[in-house]
Swiss-Prot record:
Any one annotated GO CC term: plasma membrane
Name the UniProt record assigns to this protein: Zinc-regulated transporter 2
Domain of life according to the entry: Eukaryota
GO biological process: zinc ion import across plasma membrane
Membrane side Cytoplasmic: residue ranges: 49-60, 121-262, 312-326, 380-400
The entry's keywords: Ion transport, Membrane, Phosphoprotein, Transmembrane, Transmembrane helix, Transport, Zinc, Zinc transport
Native source organism of the sequence: Saccharomyces cerevisiae (strain ATCC 204508 / S288c)
Amino acid sequence: MVDLIARDDSVDTCQASNGYNGHAGLRILAVFIILISSGLGVYFPILSSRYSFIRLPNWCFFIAKFFGSGVIVATAFVHLLQPAAEALGDECLGGTFAEYPWAFGICLMSLFLLFFTEIITHYFVAKTLGHDHGDHGEVTSIDVDAPSSGFVIRNMDSDPVSFNNEAAYSIHNDKTPYTTRNEEIVATPIKEKEPGSNVTNYDLEPGKTESLANELVPTSSHATNLASVPGKDHYSHENDHQDVSQLATRIEEEDKEQYLNQILAVFILEFGIIFHSVFVGLSLSVAGEEFETLFIVLTFHQMFEGLGLGTRVAETNWPESKKYMPWLMGLAFTLTSPIAVAVGIGVRHSWIPGSRRALIANGVFDSISSGILIYTGLVELMAHEFLYSNQFKGPDGLKKMLSAYLIMCCGAALMALLGKWA
């Protein structure tokens, strides 16, 4: 390792001082302004998704979600990978840093290591849940016996079967009712409630039915696109058919598997963003003449990053035992940059961003973070959301998808523009 970072000569030409030029009061103010902007960005989606008095229309959350996705993708390339390349490519480092583009190499290693981690995690999650892909009988009907009103799913070649539309399956030890994703399915009464029966029967209108087993989703507002039946999601084989006797168990297993994979993606996303936020704060605290411009830009930078992270945290269907996690994750992001600014002010005479150690540390961590956010952005936020999600299905699916795409482009463009100054 010493050989890797050693120079060919004994003269250190890296900076020996930082650009700190006073303005201590303004720098202290920056701690609180960055705190507010970070908190506003990350907590607004979380609060609006949980409290009705500030709950926004669905289209507002839709915009925030995909705008934030664009912000994260642009952050990976413009605010992480490029600065990492500049830091590790600085002429004062010399040695192996002058012979190989280490920023891109570390980014690539980080990306592949993250992919390997997700492969192993997904395997053990599926194994733990007893998830296999054997042959199963095709579902033609579902029968749920419950004391509330229901409707009949009628197979044209078989007798109608009663299904209770308030039957609760456990998704994460929470009782969450399931409904159909296809809003065009209409249930109409076919007969009056029979004496002694506690179920009202309904018949789905002809021409508007699909296999209900492939349409069950949780009605919780925080579980959009989280739960789906095997064969219809990003993590399971296409067109799997489930045996009726195993359907409820398989739904629970797939829900848990989807949940655990989504949780992993959210934690990875936060990890990459927090890494970056540390050096953002340190750089701001000792900036010289560019401090005022950098201060303004980083205020919006943190707000937009928080928005991207907050929407992903908010849409995760946390179990009752983990309801505090969104608040903790938001708090971690909110505090990271302000604390880094405060620490930087405290060590302003010893922290030199252009020094050899600082360049290497900053470049390595930015490279790692860029690999994390590039993988998360391209795989989870783009490919998974646009190609494998059920939210763009239906007659207006293409219109919604193109709208989401344009919104994401706007988020990426704005964040890329901020890269001109920070």
